[in-house]
Amino acid sequence: MFSPSKFRKQVNESESVSNCESTTSNSRRILDQHAGLPISSAFRTEASDIGHHFSTKMYFKILSPNNVFALMGDNEFKTSFKIFTIFEPTSTPNGKIQSLITISYKINNVLFKMEKEIFIEKVNIFSLELHIFNFQSTNRSNPASESIHQLDLSSEALVTSTLNIRGNKITTTLRPRTSPYKRAGDASMSREDLRSPDSVSTFTTVLHVFHKVFQVAATYTIRENRSERQTKVKLESLERRLKANEKARKEIEAEAEKWKDRATRNSKRLPELELELAETVQAKEEWQVKSQEMEIQNKQLVEELNEVQKKLEEIENSQKTFHQKVVSTLNLDEEYFQNPDEEQDGSLSQFNMDVLEQEIVKYQEKCISLKQENEILKEKLQQLSSSLTVNQNHVSTLMDHLEINKEQSREIQGICKKEIAIRQDHENRINHDVTLLNSLINEQKMELEMLKAEIRCLRSYSQEMSQSNKNNIILLKSAETERKSLLETLTVLLNSEEEATENNVKRTIRDLVRERDTEQTKRFEAEKAASNAEGVLLEQAKQQRNALFRARVSEEEYSKSMEKIEELEQELLASDLERKNLEHKIASLENCISKVSQLLNVNVGGVFDAIFDRIEELIAQESVYRVVVNENRLISENIFRGLQSVRKDFQSGKSGGGSDKKQPASPVAAAAKIIQERHTLKTIDKMDKLNKDLLATMTIETLKAADIEKTNLKKRMNEQDARIRQLEREKKEGERIRSIIAKWEKRNIPKTEKSSPMKKVPPIENFRAKSQTSITGLSPVL
């Protein structure tokens, strides 16, 4: 007989001594053949290698449950699980094969070793040829590793644990395809062999294994049913989300169309504003040209006034000389008449004296009247000079106003350019927002398509699960029939009439089953708790990752929203400054209008009708004054010609008096010349009127320009107010769209995220709402 203790001593001695020759050549050859073979690969030896007791060949296959355990483990376990035969197998008198093997495996990079004394027995139970291991000896641990865990391959709890972890593979590998035994029986196995106690123990182990397999299959069918219900619930929730997403998509598309319409309207308004700007620039240039022309005309009129004054001075000088000459001539005549010649007659001299006296009286009266008229004309000249100074002052003030208006027009042009640039920026931003909304709509469409595809996959998966459940039900029914057949065979085997009684067999079976059940339940509960703990930890890790990702996204969006708020505040400040500048310009224009009304002696009172009436009167008088000016020019030319003729006549009369003293100068011509001087006074009056008309026309033009600028400013202010209202409406619509998107995002948040530990983190929509409220609280312009 074989003794394990003696063999262990021999093995230790052989390991301590190098190149030991105690082992036989056959054992060395078997070790070399089977060293390092994994348990999943079956090995075979011939009968000649085992011993001389068998003349036929026998095959040794390492099968259930060990190869199942190796197949179901991870890759590390599969590659490291190895079995070695230590000595040459020997046959016992009972027909069994006795051997000692070592089993080694790794779990988590920890090496485990164990030794087993085995008896191999050939039993034909299934359609396949199955060799069962009867592990009769206790575990013998390696002395080098005392604290290492030892795996008991004889226990069925390990098999059930692996079945719980890898249930699908176990059901496919261990599911019996035929009846538990052949009813007809094999030629190599008799009915007496079936009733032996060893065969009964083997059958009990096999029955226990199949019972556990069926339990695992039932648990997996329950789990599949649960997963089927969960998939149905998920399908319903996904359909609800699809409907909500479609509604939100329609609303967003409508909002995007509105934004597009507004963008087109703004683009249509731009050319109109540009045309208005061009018109204002042209009007300003025309006004500048007219002002230059009026300045030139004013200079010409001043030059003409100076020429007329010079002519008046010359006329006064000529009048004085003429008066002196008349006096001198009169004195000469008196002397001549006081000392008459004796040759002349008395009657003729007396007649001439009477005529001269009458003429002199008339002439003196005319001189007195002319002196009075000259005094009146001098007073009028003084008035004209004072009015000229006043007019010059008015012209200087008007020129100052013109320069101020030029500066204001330049500022207005700059403001208009800035406003156009700002409007273009706003339109670009609106277009950018429209593109973003379109991209969001496209992304949501893609998400909807993805959700539809997921729903289709889930439906197909649910159909597959239902089919697999049906197949599992069929397999369970077949397993139940097979279990019934096994129970029948066991009843047949237990009702045998051999040495072992039925009560003893039942007691042993019950004890074994109780022990195994208790161990299996404990291990199953421990493994179940471990798997539940692992699932909880995985869910917590996923929730934490999702929460961190959402927190990062919220921080990024918060920073972006703060940047947008700063930009909007800067735009607000710029718009406030522009409004203040416009108000200042309006006030300056109102002051200009009040000054113009004071100059025209018109009470405006907030209404410009009086100014416009006065302007129309001055325009009507302008045409009349132009006609009068032309007439005055003709009259002045005629007067000048008459004066020249009078001067010539006077010179000719003087020369005649020197040669012939009897011929006196004609006083009628002198009187005619004096009468013509009255026309000069009329020309002076007309020049005064012309100066007044010039002032009136200048003031009218300045008032017209100021009125045009004021109307333009009012239009711009109204346009700015309309633009501000439109921006407020667009802002409200944008807030409404954001609220819709926020609601949609809240609906799409899964339950796992809602129950995550990061509930206290505020969502992105709160930051958006806060930023928007802060913007609206700054000023009502936005």
UniProtKB/Swiss-Prot annotation:
Start and end residues of each stretch annotated as Disordered: 1-25, 175-195, 748-782
Protein keywords: Coiled coil
Superkingdom of the source species: Eukaryota
Polar residues bias: start-end ranges: 769-782
Residue ranges of coiled coil: 223-331, 348-398, 428-601, 699-743
Compositionally biased intervals (Basic and acidic residues): 183-195
Keyword Coiled coil annotated: yes
Record keyword Chloroplast present: no
Record's compositionally biased regions (Low complexity): 13-25
Signal peptide location: none
Name recorded for this polypeptide: Uncharacterized protein C27D6.1
